[in-house]
Amino acid sequence: MTSLVSAQRLGIVAVDEAIPLELRSRSTEEEVDAVILAVYRQVLGNDHLMSQERLTSAESLLRGREISVRDFVRAVALSEVYRQKFFHSNPQNRFIELNYKHLLGRAPYDQSEIAFHTDLYHQGGYEAEINSYIDSVEYTENFGDWVVPYFRGFATQRNQKTVGFSRSFQVYRGYATSDRSQGNGSRSRLTRELARNTASPVYAGSTAESLRGTSAGSRNQMYRLQVIQGAAPGRGTRVRRGKAEYLVSYDNLSAKLQQINRQGDTVTMISLA
């Protein structure tokens, strides 16, 4: 847990002091309601949810303990509501960042995690991508079947990388904001840092100056690749042609272009980052 003074300065008191919610066999109706709302808040990135968008059937099953909290999280993440809010409206890298935040409660640690999930979606589609987080060992160890996922990027936990703390500020911009109302629109927040394997600047609030690490220093020239992903051979039309963005160093540019070509994807733009 971060010290109170530091948490106040960084604007993370609400997250730092939050108590995880767990659905128990003897939970009251009010406690069940709190769990359901907490799942919507976490998985949907604190975005406004209209009454007609609620998953009433899944809610009913959870109230009757016919499904677990993990199952309810899965239902929300696989729903058309989640797809419309985060899948259809974001590039692939941003979508993966949000999946890490919503389902595992942290920011991605390195480029290999982004690459893994990009390839997983390309090969297995939307459901495989979502299920990979919820069925992971990391999810089980932190939330199990009955705890509502929560943002834990500012905590110190086993198997957690230190760089995750600073990168968390890029995907978390305050308790009162939503993941669809932040600045920079749908652009990925971590593409540059992950590509360079450097730490993000830490901002003390929305308009304060940042405490910069190596990401603010000079580096070798990076190139930004914008890519349209083609469906894997033999797949149905239900898998969309997604967009992705990569930051690649000059030394790795040729190899990355060859990899993109082998995957059947199309590079639409190469520019200096």
UniProtKB/Swiss-Prot annotation:
Tell me which residues make up the PBS-linker domain.
Answer: 1-180
Impact reported for D47R: Significantly decreases interaction of PBS-linker domain with phycocyanin beta subunit (cpcB)
Q: What is the effect of changing R54E?
A: Significantly decreases interaction of PBS-linker domain with phycocyanin beta subunit (cpcB)
In this protein, which residues make up the domain named CpcD-like? Answer: 220-273
Q: Which family does it belong to?
A: Belongs to the phycobilisome linker protein family.
- Subunit structure as annotated in this protein's UniProt entry: Part of 2 PBS rod complexes, the conventional CpcG-PBS rod and a photosystem I-specific CpcL-PBS rod, both of which include ferredoxin--NADP reductase (petH). CpcG-PBS has on average 3 stacked phycocyanin hexamers (PC, CpcA and CpcB). Linker CpcG connects the PC stack to the thylakoid, the hexamers are linked by 1 copy of CpcC1, 1 copy of CpcC2 and the stack is terminated by a single copy of CpcD. The CpcL-PBS has on average 5 stacked phycocyanin hexamers (PC, CpcA and CpcB).
Please identify the protein, giving its name as recorded.
Phycobilisome 32.1 kDa linker polypeptide, phycocyanin-associated, rod 2
